[in-house]
Amino acid sequence: MNELQLLGPRAYGDALGTAVLKAIAEDFQVDEVLDIPFSGDGEHLWIWVEKRGLNTEEAARRIAKAAGVPLRTVSYAGLKDRQALTRQWFSVQLPGKADPDLSAAENDTLKILKTTRHKRKLQRGAHSANGFTLRLTQFNGDKAAIDERLQLIAKQGIPNYFGAQRFGHDGGNVVDARSWAARKALPEQRNVRSRLLSTARSFLFNQVLAARVADGTWQRAQVGDLLAFTDSRSFFPAGEAECSDPRLAILDLHPTGPQWGEGDSPAAGVVHDLEQGIAAREADLRDWLINAGMSHERRILRLPIGGLTWHYPEPDILQLEFVLPAGCFATVLVRELVDLVPVGQTDSPCVF
């Protein structure tokens, strides 16, 4: 499956050039943002870690081994890219124990930047946002057009697609999910089951969003829509009055799409019909999610880009800095600007 099939159309037109992303880890930097005041004491040791070329799960295993504790006592808020330079929090439960020597966990791929104590463990999804610094190298494109598009994106946001990495190489996770769904079975391994169910929900969401981008309604509330604020998981129905709420114009309030689960789409009118129609088109995946006991949730269709700035440190390098809510993908912003090409190759686009 190609990127257009997995995501959908761009909102702002064709790519304005080509570039390379992740030639080195420093080209893709992520800083986890937590809004948690630490107590300074308690049985949980919180660890601020910088890692490069290392996934979050492997970092957790290294911390557990160095601390001499079971892996289950190590927690983190979210998974971060392996092919990146990332800084994120971990917590280790150490009831009645002193701070362990964690130096054995460190090498050129993992550094412990600071530690503190807290009364609670780090929960999944506890981070409020992620800060990104991206360097698009070997950039070849129209800088004036890039600047104009970025100014527009800063004002209007972008479609909140799940990025292609959610679906595996060439959409392999979607293929696997469809295979399990056709057999009406679930993988026994918990991590595989979770990954494929998440893939299925993300794929259905992207299909709905793709249709809204195609008809120009992805950033416009319609009667029957379910609306949500940027950082809220709750939603409410849109009538005529809600469709002209000024908070829509300032990117505080957004229409939402389905993360499929039990029951019909809770939207109404034409929005309900669209969502039900797309789910019916993927009936095996829809029924598989329902039978797995997934509850219906919503995700905002429009992604506001916080603190967006950009400059060119070198003529062929475009550097972007911005903040996204947790669970959103930096690569969908890049996609609205340029086609990515493999390292060392700038004459043909790479679909991944």
Swiss-Prot record:
GO terms for cellular component: cytosol. One of its GO terms (molecular function) is RNA binding. Residues 157-303 form the TRUD domain. Keywords: Isomerase, tRNA processing. The keyword Transferase does not apply. One of its GO terms (biological process) is tRNA pseudouridine synthesis. It holds the Pfam family TruD. The lineage of its organism: Bacteria, Pseudomonadati, Pseudomonadota, Gammaproteobacteria, Pseudomonadales. This is tRNA pseudouridine synthase D. Gene3D superfamilies: TruD, catalytic domain, TruD, insertion domain. The gene is truD. NCBIfam families: PRK00984.1-2. Belongs to the pseudouridine synthase TruD family. Responsible for synthesis of pseudouridine from uracil-13 in transfer RNAs. It comes from Pseudomonas fluorescens (strain Pf0-1). The active site is at 81 (nucleophile). It comes from the Bacteria. It catalyses: uridine(13) in tRNA = pseudouridine(13) in tRNA. The keyword tRNA processing applies. Its EC number is 5.4.99.27. InterPro entries: PsdUridine_synth_cat_dom_sf, PsdUridine_synth_TruD, PsdUridine_synth_TruD_CS, PsdUridine_synth_TruD_insert, TruD_catalytic, TruD_insert_sf, TruD_pseudoU_synthase.
